[in-house]
Amino acid sequence: MNLSSGKNEKNTTLTAENQTIIFRLTALWALNDCGLGGFLHALNVPFSGLIIGGIAVALISFIAHFSNVNKGVILNSLIIVLIIKLLMSPHSSVTAYFAVSFQALCALVFYRILNINLISILFVCILSFLESASQKLITLTVVGGMSFWNAIDVFVENISKQLFADGITHASLWLVGTYFFIYFVFSVLLAFFIYSLLEQFKKMNISKRDNPSLWQFENVTVAKPKKHLPKWIKILLYSGIVVFVICTFFIYNKEQFYNSFLIYYFARTVSVILFWYYIVMPYAMAFVKKFLNNKIPAYQSEVDEIIELFPKLRLIVYYAWNQTASYKGLRRLKHFFTITLFEIISFK
């Protein structure tokens, strides 16, 4: 259960209590990345994608805090999370591994340079969420091409002209701007929340706290998680993009709709999808799997311990969700994560 024993950087100054806390935080990070998303969907939690990313950044920040921003500890925790993700979510895309790694490396860089304070937490949260937002938009643009955004402009402009005197122009820019703004606002709120929670932990003596026993969580009802969307759903979504673009230009901009455009756009989109799913993704995932499989022997005991801990963590997560039933919206999410963190760190 010693996460500071990897090859990256050793730190013998970590207390046994801090090593236990870091181990449990790493376990919760792995659960969050591998299975908590499905459980939040099952609980009908809104904006679960943003919440999963927010929880990950918060947990990385707490691991950095309890390890005194030790590079070896943070990187070891990251590798363990990636290995568990490979074992338990083998169909995850390579972009998911990149996002997790980016969050951890971003935290490592800024916390080591600026220490852990409100400014560095803001940098980590904002960059992590902007990377996540950019990743989705880049994928959409690669698959749909600029014609997709042009189709949105044409579609919204023509619809808005039927409702208002002046049509709405450059709708795609407004859409992308709003999308980034939502991610930015959420990241700023998250940064202030992480900072305030860290300040609470600094004032709290965990060793003298009344630690709960797991029997308190045994009667908690655990909902069945929803499965990840199969690949054919994504392909169907991309097909919908093609149909949307073609229909929009055909209905509202016939002078630009001609046979060569139809053939070109259809061939381009199909080629991109085939290239992405059958060449880029398999080779990228092969590299990721080879790297992580080489790491498994060195981390096998920690990985096994964390996977065995998952059922207990799930009980605590549902206990925390039930305990916050009287709260609504972001207030409930705030108390939910706070209770989850306190209970997981301190249970016997």
Task: For each feature predicted by the language model, list its residue ranges.
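Membrane topogenic helices and adjacent juxtamembrane segments
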Residues: 1-37, 165-170, 195-206, 220-223, ...
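Hydrophobic transmembrane alpha-helices
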Residues: 2-86, 90-92
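Short helix-perturbing small/polar motifs within transmembrane alpha-helices
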Residues: 2-4, 11-19, 24-29, 98-140, ...
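Juxtamembrane/interface segments at transmembrane-helix termini
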Residues: 196-200, 278-302
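Membrane-embedded alpha-helical hairpins and interfacial helices in multi-pass inner-membrane proteins
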Residues: 121-200, 223-239, 243-266
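Alpha-helical transmembrane segments and their membrane-interface exit regions
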Residues: 55-62, 83-86, 101-112, 128-131, ...
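Charged, low-complexity cytosol-facing tails and large interhelical loops of integral membrane proteins
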Residues: 3, 56, 307-348
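Juxtamembrane inter-helical linkers in multi-pass membrane proteins
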Residues: 203-224, 294-310
